[in-house]
Amino acid sequence: MRWVAKAAVQRGLGVLPQGERLNYVFQRHVLRSLPASESVFRRKFSRAQQHLRAYEEHGPGTPPSASVFYEFGAGWDLAIPLSYAALGVGRQVLVDIRPSVRAELVNDSLAAFARLRDELESEAGRELRRLGGPVGSADELEERFGITYLAPRDARATGLPSESIDFVSSTDTCEHIPAGDLAEIFAECFRLLRPEGGFSCRIDLQDHYSYFDPSLSRYNFLRYSDRAWRLVNSPLHHQNRLRSPDYLRLVREAGFELVAEVPSGPSLEGLAELEGLPLAPRFRVYPPEELGVTILSFVARRP
């Protein structure tokens, strides 16, 4: 039941005025999940490359160096936006519901780029832009990397000009946003994109507490009714439990044209896990092959 203890701590922090800051301290000094390990950093760089390939294949045709990328929920260490900068993206706009960027974690990312430069260039098959040394604060992001960081800023209503963005990307963020808010965020992304602009998204549909507590099934959270889940679901680590058809429906309802969807899972082991779980009624209506998707990647385009 380790996950229950973690959920209780994060739910408690979520109601405190300085909950985000305290959660950062909890993640860094108690769980020691921050800063990201080199293996996690490498994965983030690879995901930035995947998004960039989606832009080059399905985007409006503007070279990355002359384009404007947009991301909601940019997080603490900016590993993916910095990867874009290293890969040659000209301008980026990032929004967070609360100020989340931590200069010390951004500097960990910058140090990783310097340390792993040869390896990353080999993986990318191109020379990377040199990002330089540490930053003193988020105020330096725009001048040094072309990154405009806006926080606090509501991703449902950013106030940014319509049709001002070439490409939207999101990595392991959508699963943490309530469904109603996500529908509004997708609609806002549609408004921001220029015609033929692209939207590349990766979503982790697994119970994230299973990463912390190996005794849990990756589908554990599907056992609980909405009422029961609300008791443990923290605003600092919200999990909406949407399944792959739900996300794809929201994308279409926002007006996007889906051009690629790549679900991962369920494996045979995953199907066996699902069969052994007492599913909440809400989840019994999904076919197992849809309910058990663990990772959903999709690319959409504004017509």
Model-derived features with residue positions:
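A short acidic, Gly/Pro-enriched loop at the edge of an enzyme's catalytic core
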Residues: 155-168
